[in-house]
């Protein structure tokens, strides 16, 4: 399939609106053209600083604006992070992601996170961080330290965005992605479905991602986990088929990207997850927690992998070079 970054919303909607089985079948065909059919990239996510975030994301338990009963924690010691990274590697993860509840890292935080990147990288793991907004200097220093991926989600469509967050603009997010890309790191960026958005917003999110100059190497598709005390605690649950449609379209229009099952997976049946893999998902977060939300534990994932005949991918150089070459051809 030809790699494109000129998708129109009408084209994406036409894909999204196909009969469900036709869409999933097409996505699986595209998936097999670019990836091993039964291999899943496994990541582990650790919160290195929890709670009291100044942002007002309406879905997030870590926001200081809401009474979610989350107990805030100061940043954890580097040696504790390394211990967790070693355990993640022993459990089959190929990538270790570190997240901090910051609007952006302060300069006083940079030596701490740079040391962390170097130490985790030395274990032979791919490294990823999500620390909020970055300026160009911070992005370059993270890249120089060996950071492979930087996560900064767009969350939802540009049109729906202001219903979800007011303390950071949509363009602020795009600017951070530009800094990450300019510094030579790989981009991890996706969004959340089930925020109370409409179908057009899911299409809009996919359109934003697929029309970036270079597609994100990793695209997390989260399902909202309602958190008591947040404004979205009682939002109507999205039908799982809409989540799978979003995954399938992401696979078709971003064929070289890893499509990751992220938050919300803990509530899904094995059959739902199998259908998501059929729709082109080929990455997931393993472990009992994703920052502060529950997740399918490592033991459950091992059982699921055995049931479906899936194997975990080994750490390797990502497909970024292939995607860049294809887009410049």
Curated annotation (Swiss-Prot):
> Domain Radical SAM core: where?
38-262
Catalysed conversion reaction: (4R,5S)-dethiobiotin + (sulfur carrier)-SH + 2 reduced [2Fe-2S]-[ferredoxin] + 2 S-adenosyl-L-methionine = (sulfur carrier)-H + biotin + 2 5'-deoxyadenosine + 2 L-methionine + 2 oxidized [2Fe-2S]-[ferredoxin]
The lineage's top-level taxon is Bacteria
Q: Which InterPro entries match?
A: Aldolase_TIM, BATS_dom, Biotin_synth/BioAB, Biotin_synthase, Elp3/MiaA/NifB-like_rSAM, rSAM
Q: Which residues bind [4Fe-4S] cluster?
A: 53, 57, 60
List of residues binding [2Fe-2S] cluster: 97, 128, 188, 260
Q: Pathway it acts in?
A: Cofactor biosynthesis; biotin biosynthesis; biotin from 7,8-diaminononanoate: step 2/2
Q: Cofactor note, please?
A: Binds 1 [4Fe-4S] cluster. The cluster is coordinated with 3 cysteines and an exchangeable S-adenosyl-L-methionine.
The protein's GO terms of the molecular function aspect are: 2 iron, 2 sulfur cluster binding; 4 iron, 4 sulfur cluster binding; biotin synthase activity; iron ion binding
Kindly state the subunit structure of this protein.
Homodimer.
Q: What is this protein called?
A: Biotin synthase
Q: What is the lineage of its organism?
A: Bacteria, Pseudomonadati, Pseudomonadota, Gammaproteobacteria, Moraxellales
The gene name on file is bioB
